[in-house]
Amino acid sequence: MFAGVSFSRYVNHFRVEEAVKRLSDPASDILVKELAYSLGFRSDSVFSKVFKSETGMTPNEFRRSAIFIAKQNNG
């Protein structure tokens, strides 16, 4: 799956997967900037760019979408 992928892209893939988990948690109110730094990104703008390239949405758009879906599923 990752053959021919650069190391930084490989690592960023897993960073974004972790970000998706955290942003999908309705109980989490972590700021995007805090999340970016906790995942090892040097800035929130770099994190947002990488996140959008992986998911098609900014972190804030993703969080809003995940919260909306969670509310829809919970009644």
Predicted regions and their residues:
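Key DNA-contact positions within bacterial/archaeal DNA-binding proteins
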Residues: 44-45, 60
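A short, amphipathic alpha-helical segment
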Residues: 52, 56, 60, 64-67
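Terminal helix-turn-helix DNA-binding modules in bacterial transcription factors
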Residues: 2-42, 65-75
